[in-house]
């Protein structure tokens, strides 16, 4: 199974993503980080293949963490999660920094799994 780390400051969003991922049969959720700094630490300890990370979080946000991860770990695939939709500077910046895709909130299980499977 492919290991996925969920990063979101909202526990309800994180739990929803974890449930979708765990019930898929293709992926296993290896943990939940509440901000970018925790995500970077957990990337070292849990060694996920994929990180689903919120863009806007207190402390270290998703884009800052993505900048760090793209330098430190070229293998991990990062998918950003946002309520901003597919437009705007942050969306473009995430893709420029190496995000593989963006999941828009509110999300549906089929769309989340399609994006993860395409990686």
Task: Give, region by region, the residue ranges found by the protein language model.
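Acidic catalytic/metal-coordinating carboxylates
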Residues: 35-38, 61-64
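Conserved acidic segment of CheY-like receiver
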Residues: 2-13, 17-21
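Receiver (REC) domain active-site loop signature in two-component systems and cognate sites
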Residues: 57
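Alpha4 helix (beta4-alpha4-beta5 surface) of REC/receiver domains from two-component response regulators
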Residues: 64, 85-101, 114
